[in-house]
Structure formats: C-alpha cells, structure tokens
Design a protein with these regions (language model features):
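N-terminal secretory signal peptides that target proteins for export/translocation
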Residues: 1-5
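Short, surface-exposed beta-strand/loop micro-motifs that present aromatic residues
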Residues: 38, 105-113, 161-171, 374-375, ...
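One face of beta-strands
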Residues: 46-50, 103, 120-124, 174-175, ...
C-alpha cells in the first residue's frame, strides 16, 4: 500500500462513522454569519484542506437525499454503504466522535506527497483524547500504543497491514498523521486557520457545505510561482509543436490563437486567485456541487469580473417544453469576445483571407451591437431556437447575416465544413412583427473528418448527424429589439417554434422538473444550462454504442431501460459577480433515480 493511500486511510476509517450514525433529520451546515469567526484546528499555512461537516450529520443528510430520490429503494443503497463501511471499521467504536463535529484532512506540504512519507494530518473532533483512544483503537492496537512527549505513536491495522500513525491531543480534537514531523507541528504554538483568513465567499461555501475542499492559492502561488511559470512555458511550446506537426487536426489558426488566449487567461486567473473551493451539499431535493474561486483586488481577473452583471435569465423558461437542452447567457463584452474566439461559429478556411477579414469585422460589429443576453432551446439536428437581445438588434441581425454571406466552400459553421457557400435570401418571411432572412447550407461531413484516424471517422460522422442536418435551413429575423434564429426542417416548423416561444405555448418554465432544479440554483447567473435527463442519457448511450465498434475490447452496451414519468433536469449555473466566479451543478432526486435505473439496467445488458 502506498504512503499516500496509507495517509488517507485514517480519513476513510473515521468518516466511516457516517455508516453507523442513526438516521434522523439533520439541519444543513450553517455558513458563518457576518462578523462570526470560525477557527479551524489546522495551520493557516496548510495549502489544501478537505472538510466533512459532521460525519454523523452528513450521513443523516445523505440518507434524506437518498430517500427523497429513491423512495423505498434507498434502503438497499444505504445497506450497501453501511455494510461496506462497517467492514472497514471492524471492531472500532466511534462513540467519542461527536456526530456534528467537523473533520478535516489537511495537506501540510504538497511537495512531500511525492517525497517519502506524506505530510498530511487528519483532525478528528473528540469528547476526550482518552475516550477516543479507548474506543477507537482495537484491543491489539492498544497494545502497540506508546506515549511520547506530546506525540504518541500507535500501529493501526487495516487491510491486513500495520501502519505507524502519530497522535496529538488537541483537547477538542486529535491530530493523526503518518509523518512524525507533521505531528510535531501540532505540539507547537502555530497560527490556526480561520474564516477571517479566508476570502469571504469561499469561507461561506467551505463551512456551509457537507463536504468541501479548500485550496489556498495565495500560498501555492507564493511557494510554487516559478514552477507554475515554467509549466506554462512548457504547454505553450507543446501547442506550437503540435500545430507545426499537424497533431491537432481540424483546428485552424484562429482557433489555435483562441486556445492560446484561453491558456493565457487561465494562468492569469491562477496567479490572481486567492483560493478555490470545491464543495458538495446533500439537500432533500438532490445533490448540489459547487466550484468557486475568489480573486484579489486590483488584478486583471477582478477587472473582468466586475464588468459582469448576471441576471435571472427568466426568458429561458419561455422556451417550448420537450427539448433536450436549454441554455441562457448574459455576459459582458470581454466574455463575449473571448467566447467568440473559442466557439468559432464562423471559421473561414485559413487561406480565405477575404472571408476571414470580413468575418472578423462583422463579429466585431456584432459585439458592438450590444448583446444583452441570449436564450436557446436545442432539440436535435433540425430543432433549435435562439432568442438574443441587443441594444441595436437591427445592426446585430445584419452582422449575423453578413457572417453567413462571407462564408464559402471549405469554411466551417459551428465546426462543420461547408460543401458550398451559404445561400442567403433577405426578407424571405414576415411573421409576428419579425422580418426573417433564410439561410440554406449544405455540409460536407466527409471533409470535416478527413484528418481524423480511420477508426473513428464513421462514428464521428454519425455523431455530427445527430446535431447537424446535412442540408440545413436557418431563419434569422429581428423586430428591432431582439434577434431570433430558428433551425427547422421548413418554414412551417420554424414559424411554430417562434409562436411557441412568444405566445408561451407549453413553456418549459411550467414543467415541474424544470422548476424544481431552477429553484435550487442561484437566482442570478451569467450562464444557465438545463439538461433533460431522459433525452440526454439516450444520446450519451447511443454515442457509447458507436464507440464500442471502433475500440477493441470496449464493452458491448445493450438497450437501456425506458425512463418513464415526468421529465427531470440537471442544471448548471455559472455566476460571475464582483471578485468571485461560482459554478453550481444541481442533480435532483429524480435524476439520481433515473441514473440508478439506467446503470442497473446496463449492468445486466453489458457483454
């Protein structure tokens, strides 16, 4: 067993107490109130810390989540968890561990993880040190206990092996570590970490979650800044070499430049960032996952963030029900420009200088038109509706149509190569106060995948056809306030989609599953994505079936069980506000139940 696994073993053993905790309603973790300080038992200089907010309490909240998601079937899942963790605990008792006490796993030195014994420590809340020793240690382990001057030593048994662990009595906590030097640290007068020493938003997320990881990037940047800089240079060099050697098929110069810009931005953000929290919350309605970063004042990243004004994106709920994905965005100018480069919605061939110059100018005009938010519903190759608001919608519509007109054969629209130049018919239709132009395109799937390995070409074409019709019609219209784009099989279908949205015919916002997930996400967001579970799961499984024929040894996937009942949605909300960037993913109980049903069915059908 590796030293790293051995170091984490104590955490697994103590957290297994959750399996033995009595199941009863438990209040969610409470984040610190303004002015209220939470002092932690680990050193302020610990670069990485994991927290479990009460092994017993977290277990109770997980039980409530499972019952809400699985109903009577939750008992079977809980029994599997309980049996496995009871076996891990063996003869140990954890009566000396308060069920609401916070447990911490601190990485005291990142470099030491890869050099000898890892400098990690597990901090467990206890009633008393003596009671913990007498109840947690087995009879055989107690015989190996050796008292020291502040640091005691014991051999813990797990998986048939003995592991030396050092223990320190911290009164309300006991510190355990496989490294003697780390244990010695807890006998000295060290500076304790606290919520006052953490960025305010990160402190709330860290303390207010059931399970959370905190990364102190201020400390990491100070300690490893030079190594991070060298790593960035290595990646830059690797991208350049890959492009020169043709290792990145299908990626044009503009996309490569955008990738480099993204890389530059990522490392800039890393250097500007105070810290990062990755957290999970067990809610009765489902599971919420959060990734949050907070940045230092007077940095490039904060200047960009403070220009953002997230909103409720309420218009997303007006999209017609029955589609697979719904997405709304509200970004400022800087983010719109960055996304434009990465998305490459319009990418003339690299040797089409005239087309590239025209698209560059027109996309700049699109940004200058003042985007104020966009919502979209996506249902397949010929079923997409997008509604975008602009300060100058007529200018935006003209720029968008100009981009289509600037494309020629060999260029890419939405990543797929055009067989011929798009055919644009101005003023093709008028409806509901909108004047629509019609854009007809024909794609060349074979040319799109020509640089890919032979084994994956056929499957990639099949994937493309799921999202893009080989012959596609798009209607682009404006009423002077907003710009509408509709991908449909014909004008009748396009007109119906427009009516469904503007007349609120069966809007997705009235679907119960949509409402449940939206309520659990932040009220304001810069990006909101809602994914319908049934259609998305079917699409993913179909994609995996395509892969199984191309990859030797890939499991043969049978037919998944049909998902019945009302639609459920998994939601993602990204919020850029002030000095903080936050991503929340909410998985409702209905989605968890659907996932269990699919997995259980597949396990009986995989060859």
């Amino acid at each position: 067993m590796s030293l790293l696994v051995r170091a984490a073993l104590a955490a697994a053993v103590v957290c297994a107490f959750a399996a033995l905790a009595p199941v009863a309603p438990a209040a969610a973790p409470v984040p610190p109130k303004a002015g209220q300080v939470v002092t932690f038992p680990f050193p302020a200089k610990a670069p990485v810390v994991v927290q479990l907010t009460g092994v017993g309490a977290a277990r109770e909240r997980l039980s409530a989540l499972l019952k809400g998601a699985l109903g009577n079937d939750a008992a079977d899942v809980e029994k599997l968890i309980d049996d496995g963790l009871k076996q891990l605990l063996a003869d140990r008792k954890l009566t000396a561990v308060p069920k609401d006490g916070r447990v911490y796993l601190a990485i005291n030195d990142i470099a030491a993880l890869f050099e000898g014994t890892p400098a990690v420590s597990l901090l467990v809340p206890v009633t008393t040190y003596k009671e913990f020793r007498d109840t947690f240690l087995t009879a055989d382990e107690q015989k190996t206990f050796e008292a020291g001057k502040g640091v005691d030593e014991v051999k813990l048994s797990a998986f048939g092996n003995d592991h030396t662990v050092y223990m320190v009595d911290l009164k309300e906590y006991v510190a355990l570590s496989p490294d003697k030097g780390t244990a010695d640290l807890y006998t000295t007068k060290f500076t304790h970490a606290s919520t006052t020493g953490m960025p305010s938003e990160l402190a709330k997320s860290f303390v207010g979650s059931d399970l959370a990881l905190f990364v102190n990037l201020d400390l990491i940047n100070d300690t490893y800044g030079e190594q991070i800089k060298n790593f960035k240079m290595l990646i830059d060099f690797g991208i350049q070499q890959a492009q020169m050697g043709g290792v990145l098929p299908g990626i044009g110069k503009k996309q490569l430049d955008a990738m480099k810009g993204l890389l530059q931005g990522a490392f800039q953000a890393l250097g500007d960032c105070h810290g990062l929290v990755v957290a999970a919350e067990f809610r009765p309605e489902g599971l919420n996952l959060r990734v949050q970063a907070q940045f230092a004042e007077d940095t490039t990243s904060v200047k960009v963030l403070k220009a953002e004004t997230p909103g409720p994106l309420a218009d997303l709920g007006k999209m017609p029900a029955g589609l697979a994905q719904y997405m709304g965005t509200k970004y400022g100018k800087s983010f719109v420009e960055a996304a434009r480069g990465l998305n490459a919605e319009f990418a003339p061939a690299d040797d089409d200088e005239k087309g590239n110059a025209a698209v560059e100018k027109l996309q700049a005009a699109l940004v200058a038109a003042g985007p104020q938010g966009e919502v979209a519903g996506i249902g397949g190759a010929a079923n997409t509706l997008t509604v975008a608001k602009y300060a100058d919608a007529k200018k935006a519509a003209a720029a968008l149509l100009g981009c289509y007109e600037a494309m020629s054969a060999g260029g890419k629209v939405q990543g797929t190569i055009l067989k011929d130049a798009p055919k644009v018919t101005a003023d093709a239709q008028k409806h509901a106060g909108f004047t629509f132009a019609e854009v007809k395109m024909e794609f060349d799937f074979e040319a799109t995948v020509k640089d890919l390995p032979e084994g994956v070409k056929e499957n990639t074409i099949a994937q493309l056809k799921r999202g893009v019709a080989e012959r596609q019609s798009i209607w682009v219209g404006t009423d002077g306030k907003q710009v509408v784009q509709v991908v449909a099989k014909d004008w009748a279908a396009a007109r119906a989609a427009v009516d469904d949205y503007f007349e609120a015919k069966k809007p997705v916002g009235e679907v119960e599953g949509f409402k449940v997930t939206r309520k659990q996400l932040p009220a304001d967001a810069s990006l909101l994505l809602m994914v319908e579970v049934g259609q998305t799961a079917t699409s993913i499984l179909d994609s995996l079936r395509m892969v199984q024929d191309a990859v030797p040894g890939f499991p043969k996937i049978g037919k998944a069980p049909e998902l019945k009942g009302p639609p459920a949605f998994v939601g993602l909300a990204i919020t850029l506000k002030g000095d903080t960037a936050t991503a929340n993913v909410f998985v409702p109980g209905a989605a968890i139940a659907a996932a269990r049903k699919i997995v259980a069915g597949l396990l009986t059908n995989i060859d």
